[in-house]
Amino acid sequence: MADSERLSAPGCWAACTTFSRTRKGILLLAEIILCLVILICFSAGTSGYSSLSVVEMVLAIVFFVIYMCDLHTRAPFINWPWSDFFRTLIAAILYLITSIFVLVERGNHSKIAAGVLGLLATCLFGYDAYFTFPLRQQRHTAAPTDPTDGPV
């Protein structure tokens, strides 16, 4: 009964709006929108570079849906923090390389805009990778300082 209520339209919309207000949700939405804008700029100029934007936009949508629907808790055999970290790290590196190539070539205005937006995407994906780094989120507990064998 609870599963059917969770999959209803108002519940789905509430889950979407609730997740999209979190830091991870905002980052994923920003990645999706930025990849779409870069895709439009590359399509107007040179379509050879547009595959990176398509792949990263699709991956960001997939991760948004996975986190929004709490599917990451239902599939514990996949290490989601590491998967998301490597996705964002690789995206940042590839956007940096692609943007440098595009800006060095000096094409038309849409190509230059795509290169500059690609550098912005590098910063956004790098920021996301920094905050999703799994070892950064682990908290170490303090070692007990009380003697366990009694007073000395």
Curated annotation (Swiss-Prot):
Q: What is its main location?
A: membrane
Q: Where in the cell is it found?
A: Membrane
Q: Which domain of life is it from?
A: Eukaryota
What residue intervals traverse the membrane? 25-45, 48-68, 85-105, 112-132
Q: What keywords are assigned to this protein? A: Glycoprotein, Membrane, Transmembrane, Transmembrane helix
Please provide, in alphabetical order, the Gene Ontology terms of the cellular component aspect for this entry. Answer: membrane
Glycosylated residue positions: N108
Q: Please give, as recorded in its UniProt entry, the membrane topology of this protein.
A: Multi-pass membrane protein
Domain MARVEL per the UniProt entry, residue ranges: 19-137
Q: What does this protein do?
A: May play a role in cell differentiation in the intestinal epithelium.
State what protein this is by name: Proteolipid protein 2
Which organism's genome codes for this protein? Oryctolagus cuniculus (Rabbit)
